[in-house]
Amino acid sequence: MRIGIDCRYVRIGRHDGISRFTAGVVTNLPDRHDFVLLVNDERQLASLPDGMPWELIPAPTDAGEPLVARHVNRLGLDAVFSPMQTMGSRGRDYALVLTLHDLIYYRNRTPPREFSWPLRLGWRAFHLAWWPQRMLLNGADGVVTVSATTAGLIAAHRLTKRPVTVAYNAADPAAVRSPADGRSRTLVYMGSFMPYKNVETLVAALPLLGADWTLHCMSRVTEADRARLSALAGPGAVVFHDGASDEEYLDALRSATALVTASYDEGFGIPLVEAMGVGTPVAVSDIPIFREIGGDVAEYFDPASPSAVAAAVRRVESRWDQASAASIERAGRFRWSDSAEQVVQAVERAVEARG
């Protein structure tokens, strides 16, 4: 079978979530089919495996995206998998599997900052009702999502009549921490500073833990957010890395007591998988997606309560060696090879269903 993989969401430079998901799946595809990478810029190939066949098609932001099948039909593909749900399906002569990662933007409608104002306006309008999503998903032959939590929400909101397959998000393999790395009284937070991320509660928990605890915030931060959060904490209690490199982030994880997040809502939670994968326990808000990822290995807390955050960190500290070992085992559930296999099986079922 000849299968196209839509790689047009691969970022040039550093990955974001969709870009990393695409690259993780592509790098681990099983070898029982012929795969063709579909890109809109040759520079995207630098983030993808060498030597794979590829074709150039228009960008997903092109006005003609609803009719992109006109270009794809010429490639002689049996099927296409896209890591997004917005790939045009009209007029296609191949099986199509789309991806809906999560429904978080129906609850938190702020669009990505890098979008132009027309795209931001369209983004908000799209997420005001369910019918546009249903129209997109029902235009495919199958749908992939990255968690059982989101699969349940897709069913609850009756977003598609098509079969839904779970292909978990995962983290790239990284070296496990060693005793030589030590363990400091530091907590790591990886994520944005949007209101629903609730970073303020993490900061408010620091004085309850003690003056020797620090919170390391790894992502880029605006001056306004830096000033606001610094004012809530004592001097030096919060360290802003303002866009740490992957290696700097992993180094911080390997010496920390725990990764923490107090989000009220999340689409997934890749930082949890990244932390557990190197043997760093996690203490996180008690929401369904984090329960799915952390199982009985993570510590959970009420995200509205700084004292609950502090108590969860203390519980991690009291059983740290056991929590570290269990975290590594738990992270093994989230592997790109398994995700790629699930994607390909979804494509195979879609081709079979079309006859």
Where are these regions (language model features)?
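Carbohydrate transferase catalytic cores enriched for Leloir-type hexosyltransferases
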Residues: M1-G355
